Amino acid sequence: MTTKLIKVTDTTLRDAHQSLFATRFNNSTISKLAPLLDKVGYDVLEVWGGATFDSCIRYLNEDPWDRLKMVRRLAPNTNLSMLIRGANLVGYRHYSEEIINEFVSVSADFGIDIFRLFDALNDPGNLETASKAIKNKNKHLQLTMCYSTGESGKLETKSTEIYTLDYYVNLAKTFVKMGADSLCIKDMAGLLSPYDAYMLITELKNNISIPIQLHNHYTSGLASMTQLKAIEAGVDGVDTCISTVAQKTSQPAIEPLLKTFISNNSTYKININFDQITKIEQTLEEEVKKYTSYSINTKFSNIDSGVLTHQIPGGMISNLTSQLNQNNNLNKLPQVLDEIPKVRKDLGMPPLVTPISQMVGAQAVSNVITKKYENISEQV
């Protein structure tokens, strides 16, 4: 029986704590986890980019470049990846070609092997400069499509909708022409359902030949089932994290997936050291106690079915909740969540991913706290 090896990217050092703890893991915590994760056998560790750069400077009084150098030193055996917001890099505005080129160059020199590159509007034009810079450094270019849906909440096949099957297939073909080494499907809000994933990945596999990676969030409770159907459809890799920082608005845990493929009847395998994961769980259990104040749970449920309506990505929910709490407006969170899809529709149904999600979220908060559209941000 032929078995297929599924490649696994671990997000514990980046998106997991961004989603659950407002990106507050400091260098002390990172330094304890990096060498342990390096011994697991992961194909990739996602360690940088996204909100980590901003959080280091704004909240932690740490140098983000020092963090990258430290992780590279402590995890020499595993590929390191980072998330870049296209022309926005790790910021919230467009940067010049010179800055983009230099940022990519230094990031590569400091240890990044794989650049996961996306644009909040899925606009390939906003990815061109960074893509060329990454290829010039002979690094792996993983171009990324932000998965979103219309009001129906499902992957559409009708041409009257924006986010159709053809939309994603054509975007993938464009990415291949741009020199992508692999494609990432970024399901930042956990909207991709299992059978929609099967349909999407099957169609992508029929049209492109580069590897496909699935990055999804557990927010709606669909993620683990979606990963399994994606694997059955031919996806080449998935993103997971250690169970201590998994689920809720984070990624699915690696442990159940690993157990699933240990079965003698499985046609898939993952080269992961389970005993090493157990050691990391123990370390993480102690470390996360430092960050509980940033994890504000407004309900007991482990999932949020409401995300299928408001479509807020995992990383944004933790920050939005934290900000409302700091301003003594946490009781208005349900109203803000109701307002977000209305603002999104008013703005033309863009994907809710950084920095668009922050713009829509901030406007929704303003609409709830003050008169609707009485205050409109410059970005909107």
Where are these regions (language model features)?
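Catalytic cores and adjacent flexible loops of soluble metabolic enzymes
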Residues: 1-116, 120-380
